[in-house]
Amino acid sequence: MGHFGEIAGHFGGRADAGMAYFQYICNMEEPILNSHNKDEYPPAHTAEHILNRTMDNMFHCGRSRVNHIERKKSKCNYDLPEPLTDEQVRQVEARVNEVIGQDLPVISKYVTRDEIPDGIDLSRLPQDASETLRLVYVGDYDVCPCLGSHVEHTSQIGEFRITSTSFNEGSFRIVFRLTPPAE
């Protein structure tokens, strides 16, 4: 599994391009996936994966139900009975940055529905989702089905900063920005 990141490095750091090449050179059949109409900013989209896992690990709220991921700022909404305290928000931010700092590999793996690991929530997939799914792994920290663009390693994300939060009728919103890593 570690070779996917090395292969992706030859394709501008895009793990999905590296995986496609890996399948081509192995003469594997190209997976048939649903179309994806979003053009995410890979560092912010990968940070969203880490934030989702962190929120679920700490508060058992599942992944964000509503999100909007952009280069300038991003927001994720979580189903929670009450807002997080300022201290809890600082803990979330610190944990996300800790994971980013581990320089974890971000890889994709194509699997059939029968091969999905236990614990992966498929409830948000469209009803017409293909039989083959693309799982995105952020090291051993997170895994979920995803068609978006990601960085090759978490150290390419930069610093994660929660800039504001709000709470309305059981929905806790986190707005975050990224400071690009020093080159």
Per-region residue spans from a language model:
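Accessible peptide chain termini
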Residues: M1-G2, M28
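Active-/binding-site microenvironments in catalytic and ligand-binding cores
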Residues: G9-G12, Y21-E183
